């Protein structure tokens, strides 16, 4: 399997700014960004009240192939959230039962 990695340098938000983002509801953040770079509203927390806030590390792979996710875990840094694009495929999980 070939995994293509794109390493992009970008300015990270400070811990203070990230702490302020934690208090902003996702719908408000989405509206402020004119709904650009937001996920589908069909994606929801695994349990009520669950929240996460961090820098996204995006992953795209072929249907049924979780190899890119395994690579991303080794590359991700503390505070990053893995966002996996399953290309709309809902019959197969990209990571266990999630």
PLM region descriptions:
Residues 1-62:
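Intrinsically disordered, low-complexity regions enriched in acidic/Ser/Thr/Pro/Gln residues
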Residues 47-95:
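A glycine-rich, hydrophobic loop/mini-helix early in the fold
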């Amino acid at each position: 399997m070939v995994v293509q990695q794109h390493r992009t340098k970008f300015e990270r938000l400070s811990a203070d700014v990230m702490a302020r983002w934690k208090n902003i509801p996702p719908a408000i953040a989405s509206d402020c960004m004119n709904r650009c770079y937001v996920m589908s509203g069909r994606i929801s927390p695994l349990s009520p009240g669950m929240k996460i806030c961090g820098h996204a590390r995006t992953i795209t792979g072929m249907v049924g192939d979780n190899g890119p996710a395994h690579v991303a875990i080794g590359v991700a840094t503390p505070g990053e959230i893995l966002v996996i694009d399953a290309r709309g495929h809902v019959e197969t999980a990209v990571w266990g039962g999630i």
